[in-house]
Amino acid sequence: MALLEICCYSAECAVTAQQYGADRIELCAAPKEGGLTPSYGVLKSVRQTVTIPVHPIIRPRGGDFFYSAGEFDAMLEDIAMVHDLGFPGLVLGLLDEDGNVDMPRMRQVMTAAKGMAVTFHRAFDMCRNPRQAFDKLAELGVARILTSGQESSAEKGIKLITELKAQSGVPIIMAGAGVRASNLEIFINAGVEELHSSAGKWTPSPMRYRNTGLSMSTDAEADEYSRYGVEGESVAVMKSIIERHHV
């Protein structure tokens, strides 16, 4: 049966995802940045309240996946923190200046992970040569690759996803980006083993007083009075579709 991973941006969302049937959680902060390393407080809370596997993302900033020496040092410290808190896995991705998997740094990551399962995230979709990158990640012992098939959505990238899946059973190919109940059967019928979805929506902030005259964001157009969270019913619907196909 296909595994359903839900991307969560708070401890509360992680609890919701678990309650509605998620098999695993990718834990992040900052949805508008595409996911950054969660705070220690959030990580600790999730370890105390969630029993299904949780894999935190290790990503110090938004943007590209070529990191400075200082940023990489911070990532190694965060990996140590995640390990010490007892998480079974983590999510990250590193590329070099030429868009290839940064093998020297990834070797350091695999050592620092100390047996935690490593997911190489959608940095894979920004690499120069996906088939070569797949082989390199297999060589490293990466557990899985999260990918949209180098397209804007996994549905559009299904051709590459199925081709990579056919190469080898390891790393596992996990489809992500625009995966939802309405297109889930495409991936299930293609034999994709793991599915990644945010299953979320933006909801209005509960604040009654709103100072609309200024913004705390560098994006002046950003709506600071909305919050992103997991929609439990969406998780439940996807889980039911997966279970129905397993019968």
From Swiss-Prot:
Would the keyword Cytoplasm turn up in this protein's UniProt record?
yes
The alphabetized UniProt keywords are: Cytoplasm
* Main localization, broad class: cytoplasm
Query: Under the GO molecular function aspect, what terms does this record hold?
Result: copper ion binding
Reply yes or no: does the keyword Cytoplasm apply. yes
Entry GO CC: cytoplasm
What Pfam families does the annotation carry? CutC
InterPro entries xrefs: CutC-like, CutC-like_dom_sf
Which top-rank group of organisms is this from?
Answer: Bacteria
Family per record? Belongs to the CutC family.
Recorded protein name is: PF03932 family protein CutC
